[in-house]
Amino acid sequence: LMQEYGLEFGSQQGAGNCCANGETGAKEALTRIVNKIGDSFDNTDAFMHIATVGGGTGNGSIPYTIKQFKNGFEDLTESPSQEWMNSVIHTTFAVWPYYYEQPQRHFNAICGLSRLLRNEDGSQNADLVLLASNSHLSSEDAGGNGQYDSVNSAVIRAVDMMIGAGRETRSVIDIKDYVTLPSQMDAYHFTPAIATDLNGDVYELDFMADKAAENTFVPLELGTSSVVYMIVRAPESMIDEGDITEPEVYKAYQKWTDKHDINAAGQATLTPKPGRGENVDVMLLLGGFDLNPLLDHSWDQFDQLSGRLTDDEKLPQARLDKIQTNIEDYVKKNSE
């Protein structure tokens, strides 16, 4: 895949861990980026952008590239985009730096999340922003094993279950379902919570949802969620034999949200996986929750650096102020 689709861009070797340089690199190479995408794909419904928001290149380039797609490539002068590109849905998976990492990475993370959520004028940028925290996923409390691979595996597992819900389900949750209502609610940040290989002959579905909720990808208070999607993946044999049914999944979804006093919009779906057995997987996509438990790990570092970046790295103060205002406004709205 890297050999076939990879594209190097920008005038520097990396972005020097500065998101502003990453954006500049994407702007310099926008024509090449768009042409490469057009040469590689004839059409698609959605893009999934994945970035460690503590870094510079992906963190700087992805919010800019999404904005260009959604605003008709206003910076594109050398070649036209293809018509299908104007209607693509842009989802992102933003991976938060380890809490112990250097202040620059936490500064970048705040800036990156703000720019994924909001354009400078305060309008929505990405259609959906999924969040994962390296430290939270790697902690023993979250069921991790402290290894980098555990974070990568968790992200891959979440994406696979999201895609499966729109591909092989009895009741489809497709990409438009994930983004339409949350965008209307101005609550389009999410995090997965997953439990796998639960014995479907032993455990009730609402208990399985509780086990999934123990494994959120970021720290949060469940009761602050305003959107919840529940995806249950069970062996085909269990579904065909009526051991797990869609009405039971819907009932479990309602029972679980009621139990946790979550007055949430959302959907539930049942999707098959090949083979026999009784091992069931459950994923909750929790959206619109209070972001403060995550951002509290980074605000001090952001404040520490925001006034004293070196000249070649510094964002214009007016833009930095807007970045901060945008994320503060979004967080406040979703914590009330």
Residue ranges and their predicted role:
Residues 1-336:
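Tubulin/FtsZ superfamily GTPase core signature
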